[in-house]
C-alpha cells in the first residue's frame, strides 16, 4: 500500500437503477486507474456471480481500492459498490455510511427511475456529496438537458457538476475520476484514538473463514489485535490478518487506519457471528459508544422449500447451509408437510432475494425443488390478550380464539409514463391500495405514492405493473406499519381431505376468487381416478367453491350381448357400490406437477 494520508482518501459509492450502466462504469474506472491489467479485464468485473451478469444486477456489495495520480498527488479511491434493489436497502444504507460521496448514474435516455430515487434519499440522509452522471450519452434518444431538469426539480440536486459520459466508449471517465477527487470530501480526521470500524459486509472463504469488510472510522486495526463487536456484545477474536481489495482480496502487512477500507480475518466460522452495521473495537482499548444506525436484519417474506424427490432432502439441507454461509439474511428452519414431505421454511428480505436463492439452488446444486407460495408475517391478536406472529398457514389458530388479525403495509413509489395512469390506479385498487399523492416528474412521467399490503406486493405486483405499463413502470417500497385486516385461512380439500400445501392466508374479499381459481387449476392437472373426486375450497369448514374430477368410465356391460335389462342393472349397481367403497377407502394420487402448477399460479 502507498504512504498513508487521510486527506488523499476518497470513499464513494455508485447509485443507479437496474440497467443504467453501474457495473460498466465501474469497469471503466478500474481500467482508467490501471487497477487491473487489460488482459485480465472482463465485463462486469465486480459482479462475481453468473446470475449477476445475466440479470445485469448487483446482489452482493463488492468494494475495490484504486490509486490515481492528480496534480502531483497520489489518491486512494475506495469504491464501495452496492446492491441496487429495494430488498437490500439496509445493506445499501450501511455501505453508504462507509462513504463521503456517491455517483448518481442516470440513463440519459430513460431518466430517473424508482430504485435510484430510493437510494438517493438514503444518500441524502447521510449528507453525502452526490455527483450526477448521465450515462449512455452516445445514444440517439439521449436527452441530457431534460434529464438534468428532472434531477434538479424532483430530487433537488444541483446539476452544475453533472458529467456526461458513455461507459461504452469511455467518454467522460477521466472527468468522473477528477470530480471524485475535487468534490467528494476526504474522511474527517478522527476525534478519538480508540478503534471504531464499521462492518458493511462479510464473505465466507473456504480457506480462511469469514472475511469481514470494514471502513475504519477511528484508530487502527492490525494483525494480532484482539477485537470484539459492540452491538452484538459477543466473544472476542484475534485478528489473523488484514487486507485490501486490489481488486481481488489481497492480504497485506501493516494496519488499516482511519478513513481506509479493507477487510480482516479472525477465527470466525459463521457469517451469522458478523452483523452488517455493527462496530468493531479492540478489547484492550474499547470505544465508548458504537456507531449509529445498527439494526438486526429481519426476513420479510417466507416460503417453504421442498425437494421434488424426497431422497434429495440431505442435498437440499447442504445447499441451503452453503448459501447461508454468505447470506446472513437467509433464515432456515426444518419443517414437514403431510403432502410434500420434509423440507425447510425459509425467510427472505424480499421477492428478488427469494428468486435468487431458488435459482441458485437449482443451478449450483442441480436440485429440483417445489416452493410454496410466498407469505408475510401476520400479527394475530387473541381474545385472551396474547399476540402471535405467524408466517405459515399451518400455524393459524382456531378462528374462535381470534380477536383480530393485522397485516404489514408498505409505502410504494411508482414512476410511470402519464398514459398508463388509469391502468396503474386500477391495479393498485385491485391490490387494496390507498393513493397518497401524485407528482409530476417531468412533462411525460408521474410519481405515484401508494400504501399497499405487503402480501399484495410479494405475489405478482411487479409482473402486473410491467404488464400494464408495457415495461415502462418501475417501483420501490419501504416497510410501513401493521394495520387491521380481514385475513382468513383458505383450505383446499381433495376428496374431503385438506391438503396443507395448498392452504394459504388471504384477505376475505379475495378468498372466493382465489379458491375458485385453485380448484379450476387442480381439475386440469390431477388425472381422473376410478371414482369421482370433489375438489373444494373452504373457509372455517364452509365450502365456498367446488369442482369435480369425473371418474374414469368403464363399460361393465360390454360382455352382455343384448339380453335382459335387469342383468345390466345388476352389473351397474355392483359397479356403483364398488366405486362408493373406493371413494371411502381409496387414496387420491396427486402428481408433483399439480403442486408445481398451483404454487406457480399462487
UniProtKB/Swiss-Prot annotation:
Q: Does the keyword Magnesium apply?
A: no
CC annotations in GO: plasma membrane
Coiled-coil regions listed in the entry: none
The GO terms this record gives for MF are: GTP binding; GTPase activity; ribosome binding; translation elongation factor activity
Name of the protein in question? Elongation factor 4
The record lists the organism as: Chlamydia trachomatis serovar L2 (strain ATCC VR-902B / DSM 19102 / 434/Bu)
Give the record's family classification.
Answer: Belongs to the TRAFAC class translation factor GTPase superfamily. Classic translation factor GTPase family. LepA subfamily.
Where is GTP annotated to bind?
A: 19-24, 135-138
> What gene name is given for the protein in this entry?
lepA
Q: Which domain of life is it from?
A: Bacteria
Q: How does it sit in the membrane?
A: Peripheral membrane protein
BP terms from Gene Ontology: positive regulation of translation
Location(s) in or outside the cell: Cell inner membrane
What's the source species' lineage?
A: Bacteria, Pseudomonadati, Chlamydiota, Chlamydiia, Chlamydiales
Entry EC no(s): 3.6.5.n1
Which PANTHER family is this protein grouped with? TRANSLATION FACTOR GUF1 HOMOLOG, CHLOROPLASTIC, TRANSLATION FACTOR GUF1-RELATED
Q: What does this protein do?
A: Required for accurate and efficient protein synthesis under certain stress conditions. May act as a fidelity factor of the translation reaction, by catalyzing a one-codon backward translocation of tRNAs on improperly translocated ribosomes. Back-translocation proceeds from a post-translocation (POST) complex to a pre-translocation (PRE) complex, thus giving elongation factor G a second chance to translocate the tRNAs correctly. Binds to ribosomes in a GTP-dependent manner.
Amino acid at each position: 500500500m502507498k504512504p498513508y494520508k487521510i486527506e488523499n482518501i476518497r470513499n464513494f459509492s455508485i447509485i443507479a437503477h437496474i440497467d443504467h450502466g453501474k457495473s460498466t462504469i465501474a469497469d471503466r474506472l478500474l481500467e482508467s486507474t490501471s487497477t487491473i491489467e487489460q488482459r485480465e479485464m472482463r465485463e462486469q468485473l465486480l459482479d462475481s456471480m453468473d446470475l449477476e451478469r445475466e440479470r445485469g444486477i448487483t446482489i452482493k456489495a463488492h468494494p475495490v481500492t484504486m490509486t490515481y495520480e492528480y496534480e502531483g498527488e497520489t489518491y486512494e479511491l475506495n469504491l464501495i459498490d452496492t446492491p441496487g434493489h429495494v430488498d437490500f436497502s439496509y445493506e445499501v444504507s450501511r455501505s453508504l455510511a462507509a462513504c463521503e460521496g456517491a455517483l448518481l448514474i442516470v440513463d440519459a435516455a430513460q431518466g430517473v427511475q424508482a430504485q435510484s430515487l430510493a437510494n438517493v434519499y438514503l444518500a441524502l440522509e447521510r449528507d453525502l456529496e452526490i455527483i450526477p452522471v448521465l450515462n449512455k450519452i452516445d445514444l440517439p434518444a439521449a436527452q441530457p438537458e431534460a434529464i438534468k431538469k428532472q434531477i434538479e426539480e424532483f430530487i433537488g440536486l444541483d446539476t452544475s457538476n453533472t458529467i456526461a459520459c458513455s461507459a461504452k466508449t469511455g467518454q467522460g471517465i477521466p472527468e468522473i475520476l477528477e470530480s471524485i477527487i475535487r468534490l467528494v470530501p476526504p474522511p474527517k480526521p478522527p476525534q478519538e484514538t480508540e478503534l471504531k470500524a464499521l462492518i458493511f459486509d462479510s464473505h465466507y472463504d473456504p480457506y480462511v473463514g469469514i472475511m469481514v469488510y470494514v471502513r475504519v472510522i477511528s484508530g487502527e486495526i492490525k494483525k494480532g489485535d484482539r477485537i470484539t463487536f459492540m452491538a452484538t456484545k459477543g466473544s472476542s477474536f484475534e485478528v489473523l490478518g488484514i487486507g485490501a481489495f486490489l481488486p481481488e482480496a489481497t492480504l497485506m502487512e501493516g494496519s488499516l487506519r482511519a478513513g481506509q477500507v479493507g477487510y480482516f480475518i479472525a477465527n470466525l466460522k459463521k457469517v451469522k457471528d458478523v452483523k452488517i452495521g455493527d462496530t468493531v473495537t479492540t478489547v484492550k482499548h474499547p470505544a465508548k459508544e458504537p456507531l449509529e444506525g445498527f439494526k438486526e436484519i429481519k426476513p420479510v417474506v417466507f416460503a417453504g422449500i421442498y425437494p421434488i424427490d424426497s431422497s434429495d432432502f440431505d442435498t437440499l439441507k447442504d445447499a441451503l447451509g452453503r448459501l447461508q454461509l454468505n447470506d446472513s439474511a437467509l433464515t432456515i428452519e426444518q419443517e414437514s408437510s403431510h403432502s410434500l414431505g420434509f423440507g425447510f421454511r425459509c425467510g427472505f428480505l424480499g421477492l428478488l432475494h427469494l428468486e435468487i436463492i431458488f435459482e441458485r439452488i437449482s443451478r449450483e446444486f442441480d436440485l429440483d425443488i417445489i416452493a410454496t407460495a410466498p407469505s408475510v408475517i401476520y400479527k394475530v391478536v387473541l381474545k385472551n390478550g396474547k399476540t402471535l406472529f405467524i408466517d405459515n398457514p399451518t400455524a393459524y389458530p382456531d378462528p374462535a380464539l381470534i380477536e383480530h388479525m393485522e397485516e404489514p403495509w408498505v409505502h410504494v413509489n411508482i414512476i410511470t409514463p402519464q398514459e398508463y395512469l388509469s391502468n396503474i390506479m386500477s391495479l393498485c385498487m385491485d391490490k387494496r391500495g390507498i393513493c397518497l399523492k401524485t407528482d409530476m416528474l417531468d412533462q411525460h412521467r408521474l410519481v405515484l405514492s401508494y400504501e399497499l399490503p405487503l402480501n399484495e406486493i410479494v405475489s405478482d405486483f411487479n409482473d402486473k405493473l410491467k404488464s400494464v405499463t408495457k415495461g415502462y413502470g418501475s417501483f420501490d417500497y419501504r416497510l410501513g406499519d401493521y394495520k387491521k385486516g380481514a385475513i382468513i385461512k383458505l383450505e383446499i380439500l381433495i376428496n374431503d381431505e385438506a391438503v396443507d400445501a395448498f392452504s394459504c392466508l388471504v384477505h376475505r374479499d379475495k378468498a372466493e376468487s382465489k379458491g375458485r381459481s385453485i380448484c379450476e387449476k387442480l381439475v386440469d392437472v390431477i388425472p381422473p381416478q376410478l371414482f369421482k373426486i370433489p375438489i373444494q375450497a373452504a373457509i372455517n369448514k364452509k365450502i365456498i367453491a367446488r369442482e369435480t374430477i369425473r371418474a374414469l368410465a368403464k363399460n361393465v356391460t360390454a360382455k352382455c350381448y343384448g339380453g335382459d335389462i335387469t342383468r345390466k342393472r345388476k352389473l351397474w349397481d355392483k359397479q356403483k357400490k364398488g366405486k362408493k367403497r373406493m371413494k371411502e377407502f381409496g387414496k387420491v394420487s396427486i402428481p408433483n406437477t399439480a403442486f408445481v402448477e398451483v404454487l406457480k399460479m399462487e
